[in-house]
């Protein structure tokens, strides 16, 4: 099996590459990543000498580069992690999110059509569903929950998902989509909630919590997410959307308190920021 993994130098993508090379030593994994601020090539250092791994620095928006890679590698499958994913950044500069998340996805699917891949998998987010009511902790998102986006980021991911499904219905492209809740674990980008709180607590810095801190998120360990994608790309039904979650709901304030407790730090008051957009 020859798999192109886009965005593989990022947090979830790199963990997925490690998982796949460890579980399937005969698979060939090609990482396509343009190394934006969220990508870190040193993350992939443990697999750089693996003969079944190749890294290519290119953007999924570069049609010529993508087609050239497909011609060289003849992939059986594409797993697309490549995305701009920070909500606040999408509010400041939405265009780059449209370019990468929508145009980049269309380039990949056109390449998949042209070169006849066996499966295209789109890694999406539960943010396309919007927010659950704070007073209804018993509710969960389902695959048939209506899309209700709240930022340029989530809108761009929802648009990409719809485009992927349209390519399946129009051209018969064999696709699957996964929408996951918040991940945590190794190589998490430091601007995200959990690594930021850990770093600040260790250095006795303020712990910035957005809004009231009562926003509820479902948290999933990144390796569990990788296992879910592995299962979907090998056994999932073409044309289906799969939600991936941990049923591990915590408010942001609960997360901060857990981190302070585990680090044996005093339960200091959090700094409230006037924003509800950061994840």
Each predicted region: which residue ranges?
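N-terminal Rossmann-like NAD(P)+-binding domain of SDR-like oxidoreductases, especially those catalyzing
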Residues: 1-183, 223, 252, 261-262
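C-terminal substrate-binding subdomain of Rossmann-fold SDR/epimerase-dehydratase oxidoreductases
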Residues: 3, 22, 29, 58, ...
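Short histidine/acidic/glycine/proline-rich micro-motifs that form metal-
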Residues: 35, 182-185, 215-216, 246
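Short acidic-hydrophobic sequence patches enriched in Asp/Glu that either
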Residues: 36, 189, 193, 251
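A glycine/serine/threonine-rich, flexible loop-to-helix segment
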Residues: 47, 135-136, 190-198, 259
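Active-site helix-initiating loop/hinge in glycosyltransferases
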Residues: 185, 189, 218-221
């Amino acid at each position: 099996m020859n798999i192109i993994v886009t965005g593989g130098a990022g947090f979830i993508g790199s963990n997925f590459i490690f998982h796949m090379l460890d579980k399937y030593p005969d698979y060939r994994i090609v990482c396509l990543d343009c190394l934006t601020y969220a990508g870190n090539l040193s993350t992939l250092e443990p697999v750089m000498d693996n003969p079944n791994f190749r890294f290519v620095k290119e953007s999924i928006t570069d049609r010529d580069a993508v087609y050239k890679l497909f011609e060289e590698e003849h992939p059986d499958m594409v797993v697309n992690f490549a995305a701009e994913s920070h909500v606040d950044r999408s509010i400041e500069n939405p265009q780059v999110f449209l370019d990468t998340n929508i145009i980049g996805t269309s380039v990949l699917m056109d390449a998949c059509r042209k070169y006849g891949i066996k499966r295209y998998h789109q890694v999406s987010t539960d943010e396309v569903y919007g927010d659950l009511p704070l007073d209804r902790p018993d509710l969960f998102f389902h695959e048939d929950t209506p899309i209700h986006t709240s930022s340029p980021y989530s809108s761009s991911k929802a648009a990409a998902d719809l485009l992927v499904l349209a390519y399946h219905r129009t051209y018969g492209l064999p696709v699957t989509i996964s929408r996951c809740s918040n991940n945590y674990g190794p190589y998490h980008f430091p601007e995200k909630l959990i690594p930021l709180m850990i770093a600040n607590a260790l250095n006795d810095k303020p712990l910035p919590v957005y809004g009231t801190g009562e926003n509820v998120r479902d948290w999933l360990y990144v390796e569990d997410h990788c296992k879910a994608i592995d299962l979907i790309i090998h056994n999932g039904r073409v044309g289906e959307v799969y939600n991936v979650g941990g049923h591990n709901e915590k408010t942001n304030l609960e997360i901060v308190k857990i981190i302070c407790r585990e680090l044996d730090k005093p339960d200091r008051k959090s700094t409230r920021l006037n924003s509800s957009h950061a994840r």
